[in-house]
């Protein structure tokens, strides 16, 4: 643990820097760095992430004792630089207390503003500033925020009413005002008193008047917020470890709510939605930062071009825009010029798109935060390629800047343009996060989660979202909000998740109580379908059809860069020519797994398959298999043709035979009729196929050994298809894979059957094709005896699904009953069927690759389980020298990027 617990910054100096994210969190490290490069930042200090972990180890009282001297000295540091005193009524210092983890977690943890106010300080501050409205507006905000965050009065359930919001609405109604900003000084003073009374009633405790007590309450509340429900969920979604902890940054307050020369805002150095190299953002005059991020007031645009685009979408004339909604560039030109200059400086310093928060206090600009901005998958790719072209980063950095999982967003369907032409537009909002979303309306986050779990596609409709809505946002196809701009919580989180979002739709009249939303006089109920276009901000009635996404030139350039540096090829798992062709378009270098059993379930094929299963002699089975052979050959021909010139690895029959027979009476009666036998005969045969543990039973190569005619038929179908294609001038490259090998003798026996069948096929067609025989390593014993098996196998394909099952002893079908408990108790960090277990299963794979290549130096090795498209698993494969990873077609680009990153990490 770091000995130093508190780091100071301010007045162009800082004890930390941008490289200290682990100790100071992203926010603290960047606040220090901005001081070093001359960006105006209010003075303050950062408490390290180690202290957060210590808080959970030793408790609140002990951590306060350990930190007390350092924190009091740090407060004195701020007092000296600001020339005012914490808790002093005549010349008071107020501070903000903010969280800041190593990785950005927007809105997931807590912030407290205006800390240090009490009745005496407020009175003195009002006299000093001659602006009592600003002071008591800040005071009521502080009491509410402190009650919500520190005293934990924020409602947890959707049916609970926020006591503070209820009081505000009551006072506004009594005073005849609509907006919070129109409340009088007396109204604001009344709110402070009523808020304190509500705190006393709800908690049994008085609101703390001592600023030091307030400060410790806030610091410990931020530590606590690291383990709040939404933060835990966000970390799971983003793969952020619980052990990182959060830092706490305490800064002198600067005020955006001191009048018309004050403002607050959020800005981005590039467009976070589409990656366009255009400075953009939003600001509010006479407001505090939380107003912008929370989306409670819809803000104005910072740039003139942004304002004009917004007005055009909203149907507002240029004259009205200039009069009512001027951009900062027009309304505050000097501040805008300074802001624009600093954002450019920050982007060039960090060499990445920046997300910045700022406040203007009576004409002076202050920066409160900068961080690498969250962005959509499309923006991620465009920004990386643009920065490369601009000379700000090199090729390797461009590859490493991109998150493999986010490429998935680029492959999602988009609205069909023809369908859009006839679709009914019911509302226009801001294009907060691009994409196409169709679903049934729900109004609460927990309903979105429940409906999603029941198999429904939903659109979450809210007045505005808050961090508590995270689980519902993750479950929804898209998010629609009545309030909030392009930098609101809904917009920022949706972009980070890759979710479609339309925000700031003023035409929405949402009733949570009735579960309805009214748009231009038309009422839409929970369960009604709507569609969102997150690229244009348009909302449509009903379901609008979608089509496959069109990939950009930037995407192709990124993929070409990946191929330049990668050593691990990416193949695909494909059972149909259509899947094979799609994967080829995504850059797959062949097929790593074709599952032959999926081909048997079409009507005519399943009848012949069942006839083979029912047969009680070799002759009977061969007769049925002869019917199957032309079907199989046609299937294989289509796949080999789609992958012409690339290898196609075909797995022989793997599942147990009982999967091909009906287990219900109606199905058995149909089968009996098809076979021309009695239902009793069918029942007897079905019963005879039953196994207590089919996963370890009569399947894979065991089927081929007990029924070699199955292996022979499949070999003839594969090689027959290849011979036909060769005669047509094509270049088929078949690979025949024997599944579930546990001993070398199993492989030897199956290899003999395959080679004998191959001779027959080549004699029949009068031509030969080159093919390879390999095996699937999915039994631990096969991995441990790889040195033996490699003498017979030309390649190894690791079936990581079954290898994980047999190494852990977990059933993939049953793990869901205990996995949540294992994850919660930290027995497992991740689902081993989603992310390859590198310490156990991975060690077996590494051992088998090494042992196999000692016997056969040119042994080709790949994986073809679900892990073949999971980035960390692909990187592992690259690092241990495997030849390929195979995954589903839509994950091919993800695996290509991960493979390139794995190669670069090995340099």
Where would I find each of the regions flagged by the language model?
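Nucleotide/phosphate-binding sheet-loop regions of phosphoryl- and nucleotidyl-transfer enzymes
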Residues: 1-423, 450, 456-459, 466-471, ...
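Short beta->alpha connector loops at strand-helix junctions that form conserved
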Residues: 45, 482-484, 503-506, 594, ...
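Long, charged amphipathic helices and adjacent flexible linkers at domain junctions
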Residues: 69, 237, 399-451, 457-458, ...
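Conserved alpha/beta-domain cores
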Residues: 98-99, 551, 561-907
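Structural motif
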Residues: 249, 442, 459-461, 480, ...
């Amino acid at each position: 643990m770091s000995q130093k617990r508190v780091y100071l910054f301010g007045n162009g100096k800082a004890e930390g820097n941008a490289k200290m994210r682990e100790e100071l969190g992203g926010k603290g490290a960047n606040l220090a760095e901005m001081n070093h490069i001359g960006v105006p930042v209010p003075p303050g200090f950062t408490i390290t992430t180690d202290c957060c972990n210590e808080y959970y180890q030793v408790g609140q009282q002990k951590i306060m004792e350990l930190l007390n001297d350092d924190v009091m000295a740090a407060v004195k540091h701020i007092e000296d630089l600001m020339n005012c005193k914490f808790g002093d009524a005549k010349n008071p210092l107020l501070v903000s207390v903010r969280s800041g983890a190593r990785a950005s977690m927007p809105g997931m943890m807590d912030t407290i503003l205006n800390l240090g106010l009490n009745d005496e300080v407020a009175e003195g501050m009002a006299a000093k500033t001659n602006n009592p409205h600003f002071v008591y507006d800040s005071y009521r905000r502080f009491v509410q925020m402190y009650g919500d965050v520190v005293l934990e009065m924020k409602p947890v359930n959707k049916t609970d009413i926020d006591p503070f919001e209820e009081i505000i609405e009551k006072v506004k109604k009594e005073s005849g005002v609509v907006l919070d900003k129109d409340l009088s000084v007396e109204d604001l003073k009344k709110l402070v008193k009523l808020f304190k009374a509500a705190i006393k009633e709800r908690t049994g405790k008085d609101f703390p008047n001592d600023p030091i007590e307030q400060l410790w309450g806030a610091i410990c509340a931020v530590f606590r917020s690291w383990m709040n429900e939404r933060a835990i969920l966000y970390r799971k979604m983003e793969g952020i470890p619980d052990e990182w902890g959060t830092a706490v940054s305490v800064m002198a307050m600067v005020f955006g709510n001191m009048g018309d020369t004050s403002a607050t805002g959020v800005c981005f150095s590039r467009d976070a939605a589409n990656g366009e190299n255009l400075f953009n953002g939003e600001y509010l005059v006479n407001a505090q930062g939380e107003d912008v991020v929370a989306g409670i007031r819809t803000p104005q645009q910072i740039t003139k071009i942004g304002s004009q685009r917004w007005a055009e979408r909203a149907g507002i004339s240029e004259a009205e825009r200039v009069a009512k909604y001027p951009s900062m560039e027009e309304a505050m030109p000097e501040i805008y010029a300074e802001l624009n200059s600093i954002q450019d400086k920050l982007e060039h310093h960090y060499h990445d798109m920046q997300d910045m928060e700022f406040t203007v206090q009576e004409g002076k600009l202050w920066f409160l935060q900068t961080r690498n901005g969250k962005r959509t998958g499309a923006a991620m790719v465009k920004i990386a390629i643009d920065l490369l072209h601009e000379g700000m980063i090199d090729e390797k950095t461009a590859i490493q800047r991109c998150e493999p999982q986010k490429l998935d967003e680029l492959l999602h369907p988009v609205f069909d343009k023809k369908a859009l032409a006839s679709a009914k537009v019911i509302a226009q909002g801001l294009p907060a996060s691009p994409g196409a979303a169709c679903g049934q309306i729900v109004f609460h986050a927990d309903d979105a989660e429940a409906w999603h779990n029941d198999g429904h596609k939903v659109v979450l409709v809210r007045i505005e979202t808050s961090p508590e809505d995270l689980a519902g946002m993750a479950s929804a196809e898209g998010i629609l909000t009545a309030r909030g701009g392009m930098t609101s919580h809904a917009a920022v989180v949706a972009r980070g998740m890759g979710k479609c979002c339309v925000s700031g739709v003023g035409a929405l009249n949402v009733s949570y109580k009735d579960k309805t939303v009214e748009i231009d006089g038309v009422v839409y109920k929970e369960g009604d379908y709507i569609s969102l276009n997150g690229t244009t901000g348009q909302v449509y009635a009903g379901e609008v059809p979608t089509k496959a996404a069109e990939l950009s030139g930037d995407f192709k350039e990124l993929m070409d860069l990946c191929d330049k540096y990668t050593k691990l090829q990416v193949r695909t798992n494909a059972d149909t020519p259509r899947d094979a062709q799609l994967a080829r378009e995504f850059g797959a270098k062949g097929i790593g797994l074709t599952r032959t059993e999926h081909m048997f379930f079409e009507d005519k094929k399943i009848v012949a398959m069942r006839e083979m299963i029912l047969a009680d002699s070799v002759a009977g089975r061969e007769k049925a298999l002869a019917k199957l052979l032309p079907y199989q050959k046609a299937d294989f021909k289509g796949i080999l043709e789609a992958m012409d010139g690339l290898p196609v690895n075909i797995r022989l029959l793997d599942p147990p035979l009982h999967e091909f027979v009906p287990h219900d009476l109606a199905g058995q009666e149909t089968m009996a009729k098809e076979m021309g036998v009695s239902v009793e005969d069918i029942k007897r045969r079905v019963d005879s196929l039953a196994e207590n543990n089919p996963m370890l039973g009569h399947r894979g190569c065991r089927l081929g050994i007990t029924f070699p005619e199955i292996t022979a038929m499949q070999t003839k179908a594969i090689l027959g298809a290849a011979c036909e294609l060769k005669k047509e001038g094509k270049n088929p490259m078949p690979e025949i894979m024997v599944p579930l090998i546990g001993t070398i003798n199993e492989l030897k026996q199956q290899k003999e059957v395959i080679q004998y069948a191959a001779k027959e096929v080549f004699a029949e067609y009068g031509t030969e094709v080159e093919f390879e025989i390999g095996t699937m390593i999915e039994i631990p014993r096969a991995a441990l005896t790889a040195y033996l098996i490699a003498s017979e196998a030309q390649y190894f394909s690791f079936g990581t699904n079954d290898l994980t099952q047999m190494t852990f002893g977990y059933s993939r079908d049953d793990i869901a009953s205990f996995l949540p408990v294992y994850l919660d108790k930290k027995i497992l960090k991740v689902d081993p069927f989603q992310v390859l277990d590198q310490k156990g299963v991975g060690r077996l794979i590494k051992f088998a690759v090494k042992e196999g290549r000692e016997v056969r130096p040119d042994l080709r090795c790949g994986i073809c389980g679900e892990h073949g498209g999971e980035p960390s698993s692909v990187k592992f494969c690259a690092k241990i020298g495997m030849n390929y990873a195979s995954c589903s077609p839509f994950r091919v680009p993800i695996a290509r990027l991960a493979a390139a990153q794995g190669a670069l990490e090995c340099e």
